[in-house]
Structures are given as structure tokens and as C-alpha cells.
Amino acid sequence: MDWINEKPWNGLSVDINPNISPHEMVYKAKLDLETSWNPTGGVRPGRPKSYANQEMFQFFKSFTEHGGVPLETIGTLDNGRIVWALATLKEEFTLMKADNVKAYLLLYSRNKNRDNIEIYFTTFRQAGGNTLQIPSKARTFFKNICRRPFTKQFPFISLEFHKFDESIIRKTKETITHGREAIIDFAKNAECLINKKVNNQIANRYMFDVFQPEISKNLSSIGNKEVNELADKKTKIGIEAITKAPGQNLETSCMTAWSLLNAVTYTVDHCLGSDQDSRLRLAWFGPGAKIKQRALELAQNL
């Protein structure tokens, strides 16, 4: 196992200046060609994809500008089907003067017409490069009001641009506020997690509870014998990551609930999936995201 220490989106994204235009974002994300997300080739009927992506990036840009959070990175997954962006929040925190955790707003679109925008808030632990979605009271779904309607006459698209009105600006600011509050609360929870000491028995059961809950409930104790005979690949990697993953040598992670949580998020972000693209897709938008949430709940209940 190679225990790499890098951002899970390395190679799948590009850092940007938040002041560039939506058109430039389309170009930088390599979404300016129809075939970039249509592997069978050809041109899809209706409005050109570049318009859809430009208007999606226009929403990203307007949302982050009105919310006061600068865009930092844009990227794509699944051959361009999913387009995402990260905007930096100022609510980053550091545990015991060494374990730095950054905070981001993640915006993304999985809808091929780019009519819908989804968001959530995530942390990024720099030691290890693992992410965790932070539950909040914020809205998670927005209609892309920047999309222009298709017309039957040349130029086949409305020339009227839709801008954020007072209502959507208010909702944007409320969403960002809820996200900031959730990150602040998580920072307090993280402080509690680093003060919860665990032993090997607790650590083994935790990993089984996260990855194989159907087995752990039938075991009175989980030692090396049970790990060797019953643990699947994910569970074994998670147990190994407790001590071997990057960042696990920090004082915050010396057999603490925090170290267990980060072992899981590292495993999901860096060790599962057939390739980096599928790994990040599953970690952010698929079963991996649910595994992380279960890991967070279990860590808080230790």
C-alpha cells in the first residue's frame, strides 16, 4: 500500500483565479468540446454544451461572489458528466498547533443540462489530504437561474441573461452562513475527538462498525484472530491506516477517536475505487460519502 499525501483531486482539477470569466473556466476545465463528455462522439441535439457549462460556471461565480467565498479550484469527473468547484471558507482551524484543517464550499452539477446545482460543505485535512462532508442546515439544491431558455429561431438561445435577484442573494448568504456555523461546530467536535483515547480493541470494532456492521454486531470481541479471518479489504486497509496513513503520527492522532475518523476518510479518499476518478466520485457523491458520515457519527459516540 502506497500511503500518499496529496489532495484527492490532484490531476482531476485546475486551480483558478476567481476573477476569470465563465468562458475561461469552461476552457480551463476542458469542457469546450462536445466530445469531452460524450465518449461516443457526435453532437447532441439542442443547445451547445459549452453554453450549458458557461451558465453553470456563471452560477458558481455569482453564488460565491455574493456569498463572499472565492473560487479556488474547478474540476470534472466521469468524463465531464460531473462538474465541480471548491470555494475557500475562512473557517479553517488547527488542532494542537499542528493538525491543520481547511474548510470549503463544494458546488457541483450532475445534471447533463446543468439546470440544477448542488452544494455541500467539506473539510480538508492537510496532513493526509482527506475530506469530510460536514452536515449543516444549509440548502443543498438550487435551480440554475443563469440558464437561458432554448429558442427555435436563430441564434437558438435567449439573449437575456438572468442575474441573481434579491431573493436568491439572500438565500445564498443564508446558505453560506449555515455552512460557516457547521464548520465552527465541527471544529469544536474535533477538539473533543482528539481527547477521546482508544485502544486496539476499540479501534478494531470501530472499523468493523464502519465497513462491516452486519458482522461486528455478532462479535463480543475483535482481536487479531477476528481481523485476520473476518475483515474484508476495506476494513483491513482502515485498520492499517490508523497508524500508517499520512498525518497519523501527529499528537492529535495517537490512538484517538480523531485518528480513527481520519483513517476512514483517508481510506475512502485514497484507497478505494478502481481509479482516482471513480475513487473521488464515490467519496464525494456515492457510497463513500455515506461511509464517512457513519464514521463521523460512530467517532462522536465513542
Where are these regions (language model features)?
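N-terminal low-complexity, intrinsically disordered segments
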Residues: M1-D78
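Intrinsically disordered, low-complexity regions enriched in serine/threonine
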Residues: M1-M25, A29-L33, E92-L302
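Residues at beta-strand starts and edge strands
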Residues: Q54, R81-V83, V101
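Short linear motifs at secondary-structure transitions and domain/linker junctions
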Residues: F59-T64, V83, M96-A98
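Beta-rich nucleic-acid/ligand-interaction surfaces
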Residues: E72-E92
